[in-house]
């Protein structure tokens, strides 16, 4: 640590230089995060010092968290859902498996997880001492439902389905998984961290949420397609009392028990997430998603015209291509585990950006 503090001008000159080293969103095509909506930023700044980990000190902020869960529950066809604001999909997925493990006590628990699942499930299983039983994807890069039942045994505590996979933008057949979960009396967690704020706004959305009786919990990240400030995730559970399985005593706080994973939790990003949803409304979110899907379709058509075939036809705004072609200079794309080029058409990705990318990769 410095013995003598820096002058403000010197300090912010240093910080500005470091910020300039960061990449600009105008050329980022690989990220599932986006430029926050100005409304989210404004709301975030209003609640910068609030801590949801001690809600008795910040009752107004805590009420915003309840409203956020209510809004998301309504969107997912179950207004009475329980839940809380998390740091993002990783925390939500860990907590969902904690609930599943607490509900079904077995000596050697396992969970049946898609090949296409996010790497956070590996973290969750490592932390919780749960075996991962991975089910392969079919040709469309959705979970091969025919393999799921065979993977279940007496020690299986949960199934996982993906609604908007990180790498390919596919939505598993959650209806089929929900049926299996009901038949086998298993917990079903749906990771909709990305797709949760895309799918409900599509013209013909596939079923993935609490409208399916077998769905137990859903992860969704407002800091992705919800255009909130970071970090803003949410875990929703079908019955609020399910969260009680996670309770621990907190004798010196303004609440005597808590079920969250983190203690200190930012109220600012919750305010930002709720503000965007209420400001945009369903009509506004439908317009944003329609724009992202239009750009995705244009990108796919343009890439195929250039000789780069799609790997799959995505359900949400993630495009993948069968090519080893490097990204054009100054553009950032990513690669799937199967070696396909991966591009996400987030709200910050404009039609002009897509056209310029196609020009650059075609040269």
Swiss-Prot record:
Keyword Lyase tagged: yes
GO terms of biological process kind: carboxylic acid metabolic process; coenzyme A biosynthetic process; methanofuran biosynthetic process
Pfam families in the cross-refs: Pyridoxal_deC (PF00282)
Pathway, per record: Cofactor biosynthesis; methanofuran biosynthesis; Cofactor biosynthesis; coenzyme A biosynthesis
Any one GO molecular function term: pyridoxal phosphate binding
Leading EC class: lyase
Organism: Methanosphaerula palustris (strain ATCC BAA-1556 / DSM 19958 / E1-9c)
UniProt keyword terms in alphabetical order: Decarboxylase, Lyase, Pyridoxal phosphate
Catalytic activity reported: L-tyrosine + H(+) = tyramine + CO2; L-aspartate + H(+) = beta-alanine + CO2
Claim: Lyase is one of the keywords in the record: yes
EC numbers, comma separated: 4.1.1.11, 4.1.1.25
Top-level taxon of the source organism: Archaea
Name of this chain's protein: Probable L-tyrosine/L-aspartate decarboxylase
Protein family according to the UniProt entry: Belongs to the group II decarboxylase family. MfnA subfamily.
InterPro entries the record matches: GrpII_AminoAcid_Decarb, MfnA, PyrdxlP-dep_de-COase, PyrdxlP-dep_Trfase, PyrdxlP-dep_Trfase_major, PyrdxlP-dep_Trfase_small, Pyridoxal-P_BS
């Amino acid at each position: 640590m410095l013995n003598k503090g820096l002058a403000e001008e010197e300090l912010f000159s240093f910080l500005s230089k470091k910020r300039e080293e960061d990449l600009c969103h105008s050329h980022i095509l690989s990220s599932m995060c986006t430029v926050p909506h100005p409304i989210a930023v404004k709301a975030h700044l209003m609640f910068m010092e609030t801590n949801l980990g001690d809600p008795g000190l910040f009752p107004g902020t805590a009420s915003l968290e309840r409203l956020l869960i209510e809004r998301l529950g309504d969107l997912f066809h179950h207004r009475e859902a329980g839940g809380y604001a998390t740091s993002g999909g990783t925390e939500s997925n860990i907590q969902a498996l904690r609930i599943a493990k607490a509900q079904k006590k077995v000596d050697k628990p396992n969970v049946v997880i898609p090949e296409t699942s996010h790497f956070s499930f590996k973290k969750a299983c490592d932390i919780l001492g749960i075996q991962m039983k991975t089910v392969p994807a079919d040709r469309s890069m959705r979970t091969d439902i025919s393999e799921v039942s065979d993977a279940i045994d007496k020690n299986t505590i949960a199934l996982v389905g993906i609604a908007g996979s990180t790498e390919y933008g596919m939505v598993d057949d959650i209806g089929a998984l929900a049926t299996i979960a009901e038949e086998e009396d298993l917990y079903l967690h749906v990771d909709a961290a990305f797709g949760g704020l895309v799918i409900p706004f599509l013209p013909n959305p596939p079923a993935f949420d609490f409208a399916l009786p077998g769905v137990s919990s859903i992860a969704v990240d407002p800091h992705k397609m919800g255009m909130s400030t970071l970090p803003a995730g949410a875990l929703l559970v079908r019955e609020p009392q399910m969260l009680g399985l996670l309770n621990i005593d907190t004798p010196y706080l303004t609440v005597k028990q808590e079920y969250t994973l983190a203690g200190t939790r930012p109220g600012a990003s919750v305010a930002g997430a709720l503000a965007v949803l209420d400001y945009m409304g369903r009509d506004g979110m439908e317009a944003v998603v329609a724009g992202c899907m239009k750009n995705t379709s244009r990108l796919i058509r343009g890439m195929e015209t250039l000789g780069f075939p799609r790997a799959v036809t995505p359900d949400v705004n993630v495009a993948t291509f069968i090519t080893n072609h490097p990204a054009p200079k100054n553009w950032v794309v990513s690669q799937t585990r199967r070696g396909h080029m991966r591009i996400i058409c987030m709200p910050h990705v404009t039609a002009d950006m897509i056209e310029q990318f196609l020009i650059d990769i075609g040269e």
